[in-house]
């Protein structure tokens, strides 16, 4: 479908454009001298948690807090770049007595956003745009936007299935992909040397099974070993994952060692850029399996990425998940995210229907233009 108008994007403010939670934590540490200091990872949920981090809520009722909230690093450049791609709206929840302060700060810090594009209120489901970008899970779940996108923060790590990003650059790449999905495009070339093929889909869709068969039959493909946080029921090293602790995983992300990371069903998954580059340097193709978030991260860092969504009947996926040797909580998280996963298929370059294994594999081989 061709469109003669720009995409519309609604942006949150708190913890997306301006530092809210982390700033409040900083103020709390300065005022109360906590030992050890409160960290952002202690804000592991929305609202009050019954822990010491609840002290930050005292700052949310002070005008000075909203007057001095710092703009997040890179936020101004992000809005400037986004304004060239889409029509920007602000959708922000703020107490009524501080709305004037919030509006003034937005106009001062982000002059690209027109005053009549600023909406203040908690009912973000009343805003209809192509894309919503927010860090609050409930806003993403209730959004009427065609593409609600979650900004990953410690308080939404448990969320699964919905499209989520870790950085502004990843979001801008997703906007490009969404824009391209609206336009008629010629069939893109597959497997130009060297290339990356990503099989996308929820847990239990069959993507790993298809990738394994490709790796077995076509030696020109190689899979980088990914990193994932430890699951008490799956701690053995294998050919797909290195298992690390959540603390180690976070350190790898924050140090930049991982160029791509995502959370799925409460577990972290990530890749090291040098692992991908070493395969490409050998003249081989990379094949890997990821959720849509990981796939978009790859597209941010590499130009030669083809995404293929593996679609399977929901009943079959649930049966596969229930057979997994994992915790009940893990299974529940994966099942709850299935509908959101299916919505993301339009962002992929191709779709393979996994109704029957051999037929799905044959379709994948056809898409990749491999010799049978």
Predicted region positions:
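Active-site neighborhood of HAD-like aspartate-dependent phosphohydrolases
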Residues: 2-55, 194-199, 204-220
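ATP-dependent small-molecule kinase phosphotransfer cores
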Residues: 49-64, 228-286
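Substrate-recognition element of Asp-dependent hydrolases with the DxDx(T/V) motif
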Residues: 66-70, 75-106, 285-286
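Substrate-recognition "cap/lid" segment bordering the active-site pocket of phosphatases
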Residues: 91-142
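Acidic, Mg2+-coordinating phosphoryl-transfer loop and its flanking beta/alpha structural elements
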Residues: 132-169
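Phosphate-binding P-loop
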Residues: 187-194
